[in-house]
Amino acid sequence: MLLLKHGRIEILDQNTMYGWYKLPKQEFLNSEQPEPITHYIKKFPLMKDVNPLENQKYACLMKWLLLSAPITNHWFN
């Protein structure tokens, strides 16, 4: 599923509704495929067609990785 959010395209896994790649709108419209997308597909197999239990397992891993990342605000440091 593709969503347009704040001038960016977000690709979502329809089973989990987790966003897994954001792409500038113009880059998407120009049909350029950025390199990082293959990195994410390799890192999180939920992007491939696998059974729903596997999707859930990797979605939990992705959620844990995102939530465990330190939150910083570079504007006020």
UniProtKB/Swiss-Prot annotation:
Q: Which InterPro entries match?
A: Uncharacterised_Ycf15
Subcellular locations according to the entry:
Plastid, Chloroplast
Listed A to Z, the keywords are:
Chloroplast, Plastid
One GO cellular component term, please give it.
Answer: chloroplast
Q: Where primarily located?
A: plastid
Q: Which family does it belong to?
A: Belongs to the ycf15 family.
**Designated name of the protein:** Putative uncharacterized protein ycf15
Gene designation per UniProt: ycf15-A
